[in-house]
Amino acid sequence: MKVSQVFISAISVFGLATSVNAQNASNTTSNAAPALHAQNGQLLNAGVVGAAVGGALAFLI
């Protein structure tokens, strides 16, 4: 496995973990604005897409 593959995978996992943490934080805050929930939902989606793309790139590189 190349260094670039490990690097891409690490970034993907970090992005996913960060977005999940943001989503959980907004869910536990009762007075959070709806816009904040929507933004964190987009972050979560970006993390999932990033992980998928990173995984695909790891096979291609």
From Swiss-Prot:
Domain of life of the source = Eukaryota
Family, similarity comment:
To yeast HOR7.
Cellular component terms, GO, for this chain's entry? cytoplasm; fungal-type vacuole
Q: Which residues are sugar-modified?
A: 24, 27
Induction info reads: By multistress. Expression is controlled by the MSN2 and MSN4 transcriptional regulators.
Extra remark beyond the main annotation: Present with 784 molecules/cell in log phase SD medium.
> What is the name listed in the Swiss-Prot or TrEMBL entry for this protein?
Protein DDR2
Taxonomic placement: Eukaryota, Fungi, Dikarya, Ascomycota, Saccharomycotina
Query: What processes in GO biological process is this protein linked to?
Result: cellular response to heat; cellular response to hydrogen peroxide; cellular response to starvation; DNA damage response
Entry keyword set:
Glycoprotein, Signal, Stress response
Q: Which gene encodes it?
A: DDR2
Q: What does this protein do?
A: May play an important role in the response of cells to diverse environmental stresses.
